[in-house]
Amino acid sequence: MAGRSPKVRRRRLGFELRQLRENADLTIEQVAALLEVSDSKISRIENGQVSATPRDVRDMATLYGVKGLRMENLKQLARETKEKPWWSEYSGLKLDFVSYEAEASSILMFAPMILPGLFQTPDYARAIIREIRYDLPSDGIERRVEFRMKRQAHLSESTPPELWAVIDEAILHRMIGDPMIMHHQLKSLVETARLPNVTLQVLPFSGGAHAGLDGPFIIIRFPEPTDRDVIYFEHTGWEHTLDDPKAISLYRLLFDHIRAAALKPDVSLRLLSERAEQLGNQ
């Protein structure tokens, strides 16, 4: 994991407070009335939409009969929701994913069009951003490239998450930038795929129709049992997450079908190496 994420900590604190309230057989309305706050405040804290102060946590947990070390742990969790993570300096960029990625224990990715940002070289990332965000000045492009490279660096600083990615074979042939950019990108990808925490598979053209035809998605899992998995979708201009249990089950099943249809990791690596060599000779 790459560090503490205030967003994940808010979700975790909210989940624990909701469980404590339900175990105390109290409704949101009853808690709000006893603490003389609005129903929406309690609801938003429990849903992880807003941070709770240590005082909020103390007042709520006292109602639920919590004392001692458990109380102190909850208050500390509330303090952690106020911390500024390294990515806070990149306001204005899509930050939902990195907020979850920072505390992930495993990340499952399906990419049918372009390589995920965690695998991109600077030149490959720059070429993509330049095409997708043609409205950006050069410094705006460079800021985004820098952000992606920092994400990669931070993920390798501490215990990294398990990464399992399935990429469509089309990615190997779609010319992003020029042949030399693609050559270096695929060589870098081969090196990354050999890391002990990374599994990479290629979904071949020969497989025909597959379970991922609806588009790219990422499933993020966390080490804490109270943290529900998150499904992440990103498109130009917006990002969206789901943590509904039914949706999570569906996308886990989709990913299982996709990786079952993909080439085995060792075969995928050979294909990547061959394609990198072809591009290097152009």
What role is predicted for each listed range?
Residues 2-15, 19, 23, 29-33, ...:
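Interdomain hinge/linker segments and adjacent boundary elements that couple functional modules
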Residues 36, 76, 208:
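Positions that flank functional sites
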